[in-house]
Amino acid sequence: VLSPADKSNVKAAWGKVGGHAGDYGAEALERMFLSFPTTKTYFPHFDLSHGSAQVKGHGKKVADALTNAVAHVDDMPNALSALSDLHAHKLRVDPVNFKLLSHCLLVTLAAHHPADFTPAVHASLDKFLASVSTVLTSKYR
């Protein structure tokens, strides 16, 4: 459960991402594909090379979903309901992949905002991404 301090940290950190959200999403996806090659199996139709338009496009979708989750941090199940349905019923993404992408997002944010990535912010973002993952996998049951 996100505390008021966690919510504040997440909103502040995501606010600093600003117009770079799509780029960070794409970078996190690239990190995931390189670090965890089995994740590529969900994207057989994508050009997964560095800077690919498809990876950038999906990175923007990831970032937009996270921006939506930040904006609706008190009601993520409703805000992410359609996305949860998509991943559970159509795409059938293995839930472990959300943890892998979350880790890569944390690394990406830390690399771009080292001064702002304090232990408290890191912990809050980790809890937030875990909450997003929980919501996205809630309809798998």
From Swiss-Prot:
- Phosphothreonine: modified positions: 108, 134, 137
What residue stretches are annotated with the Globin domain?
A: 1-141
Which tissues and organs express this gene's product?
Answer: Red blood cells.
- The modified positions for Phosphotyrosine read 24
As stated in the Swiss-Prot or TrEMBL entry, residues carrying the post-translational modification N6-acetyllysine are: 16
Top-rank taxon, per record: Eukaryota
Looking up CDD domains in the UniProt record yields: Hb-alpha-like
Q: Where is the PTM N6-succinyllysine found along the chain? A: 7, 11, 16, 40
Coiled coil ranges (UniProt) are none
Question: Which GO MF terms are attached to this record?
Answer: haptoglobin binding; heme binding; iron ion binding; organic acid binding; oxygen binding; oxygen carrier activity; peroxidase activity
Keywords per UniProt: Acetylation, Heme, Iron, Metal-binding, Oxygen transport, Phosphoprotein, Transport
- Cellular component annotations (GO), alphabetically ordered: blood microparticle; haptoglobin-hemoglobin complex; hemoglobin complex
Which SUPFAM superfamilies does the UniProt entry name for this protein?
Answer: Globin-like
Describe the function of this protein. Involved in oxygen transport from the lung to the various peripheral tissues.
Name of this protein? Hemoglobin subunit alpha
Name the gene that codes for it: HBA
